[in-house]
Amino acid sequence: MPAATVDHSQRICEVWACNLDEEMKKIRQVIRKYNYVAMDTEFPGVVARPIGEFRSNADYQYQLLRCNVDLLKIIQLGLTFMNEQGEYPPGTSTWQFNFKFNLTEDMYAQDSIELLTTSGIQFKKHEEEGIETQYFAELLMTSGVVLCEGVKWLSFHSGYDFGYLIKILTNSNLPEEELDFFEILRLFFPVIYDVKYLMKSCKNLKGGLQEVAEQLELERIGPQHQAGSDSLLTGMAFFKMREMFFEDHIDDAKYCGHLYGLGSGSSYVQNGTGNAYEEEASKQS
């Protein structure tokens, strides 16, 4: 089977509080053979800017991420499981976790909520039937999906995505220093390939996830701007790029563990502060 072939029998499983335990049991089995985990989140935008002096633009970008992740709540998490060849498990390949979120009580950016509502996010259901993040974290910690060097995470411009996951897993605010953030990141997610970071070595590939998918001639399954569909498309893009641009081998020393827009992946931002989130927010447009 060629890498990242689309099989329309793929199902995206919706996970709410009522079926969380049952679906996490399935994931504990799936991860044994399908150890490539493509991930995406949906979150309520950006509501704050850090103030003060910053050592560098890279430092500013991390502080921008930190203050927003600390203030806001995750809305959705999508996880798609694939094997070394880019093949999916039979039946369900993608789980979309829907978290508790209350438009009356929780902070958000209005434009982000409008986009997510248009994309089919059911905020009333999130309020009434959403998953509690702390309980989800307990299940994820023992799932074999995190804290495992054999699991390879695939993402797209994913500083904020991993920021929210680290906040959930540690049940605390993000560390003040970016170096400490990357230390925690390596603990929970020892192997990460950020597709947007890989694109730096791919001639002519540019833009957000949807634009990249179109350039790679990939067909989306499910609605854009929902975490399940976006995680599935991220996984497809990784395997298609690996085949087309990397001769089916990614140099870990060069690419593993780098997040586009943060740390060593932040050199692309040279024209002032504040633009990394804007690109992040429109990454699937």
UniProtKB/Swiss-Prot annotation:
The keyword Manganese does not apply. Its EC number is 3.1.13.4. SUPFAM superfamilies: Ribonuclease H-like. InterPro entries: CNOT7/CNOT8/Pop2, RNase_CAF1, RNaseH-like_sf, RNaseH_sf. PANTHER family: CCR4-NOT TRANSCRIPTION COMPLEX SUBUNIT (PTHR10797). Keywords: Cytoplasm, Exonuclease, Hydrolase, Magnesium, Metal-binding, Nuclease, Nucleus, Repressor, RNA-binding, RNA-mediated gene silencing, Transcription, Transcription regulation, Translation regulation. One of its GO terms (biological process) is defense response to virus. Has 3'-5' poly(A) exoribonuclease activity for synthetic poly(A) RNA substrate. Its function seems to be partially redundant with that of CNOT8. Catalytic component of the CCR4-NOT complex which is one of the major cellular mRNA deadenylases and is linked to various cellular processes including bulk mRNA degradation, miRNA-mediated repression, translational repression during translational initiation and general transcription regulation. During miRNA-mediated repression the complex also seems to act as translational repressor during translational initiation. This is CCR4-NOT transcription complex subunit 7. Its cofactor is Mn(2+); Mg(2+); Co(2+). It comes from Mus musculus. One of its GO terms (molecular function) is piRNA binding. A divalent metal cation 1 binds at residues 40, 161, 278. Binds 2 divalent metal cations per subunit with RNAase activity being higher in presence of Mn(2+) than of Mg(2+) or Co(2+).
